[in-house]
Amino acid sequence: MSHPALTQLRALRYFDAIPALEPHLLDWLLLEDSVTKRFEQQGKRVSVTLIREAFVGQSEVEEASGLLPSESRYWLREILLCADGEPWLAGRTVVPESTLCGPEQVLQHLGKTPLGRYLFTSSTLTRDFIEIGRDATLWGRRSRLRLSGKPLLLTELFLPASPLY
């Protein structure tokens, strides 16, 4: 199963440098903290619609080439993050199999728990970069994060109903 928002997410084109944008847009796109938490601060009940969660081969995560270690298997999680039931964000997380050892194994078992609830409670979380992307009228971003030094790639597309717009 897929979702049209995930097709748009995969079509994001990334800027080489941070573009000159309105402060409101940059505030969302360069957010270092949890998007889940920011959505909750809007007074909304945040929930996850799980689209896909499975091990996949390299061919299904080509966008991670050069950004993550080359491995034969990756854990892929695709979701819609909803606020009061309305989709505000499409998310795609790519995790190399080698990252899934020790406490990071929990990444395979998040189910309908927002990724941010796990990531931003970890004292071992670091972020290597945030890249801003765009597809038509929608904005997104991708980040390489590390848990205990082990990488994962998170891509987020802000959907039309989100407060970014």
UniProtKB/Swiss-Prot annotation:
Which EC class, in a word? lyase
> Which domain of life does the UniProt lineage start with?
Bacteria
Enumerate the catalysed reactions. chorismate = 4-hydroxybenzoate + pyruvate
**GO BP term, pick one:** ubiquinone biosynthetic process
Pfam families from the xrefs? Chor_lyase
The residues listed in the UniProt record as binding substrate, with positions renumbered to this chain, are R77, L115, E156
Describe which pathway this protein belongs to, using the record's wording.
Cofactor biosynthesis; ubiquinone biosynthesis
The keyword Endoplasmic reticulum is annotated on this UniProt entry: no
Q: Name one GO molecular function term.
A: chorismate lyase activity
Location relative to the cell: Cytoplasm
Return the EC number: 4.1.3.40
- Show the GO cellular component annotation of the record: cytosol
Where is this protein primarily located?
cytoplasm
Similarity annotation: Belongs to the UbiC family.
Q: How does it assemble?
A: Monomer.
Q: What does this protein do?
A: Removes the pyruvyl group from chorismate, with concomitant aromatization of the ring, to provide 4-hydroxybenzoate (4HB) for the ubiquinone pathway.
User: Which PANTHER family does the record associate with it?
Assistant: CHORISMATE PYRUVATE-LYASE
According to UniProt, the name of this protein is Chorismate pyruvate-lyase
Species assigned in the record:
Salmonella typhi
| Gene designation | ubiC
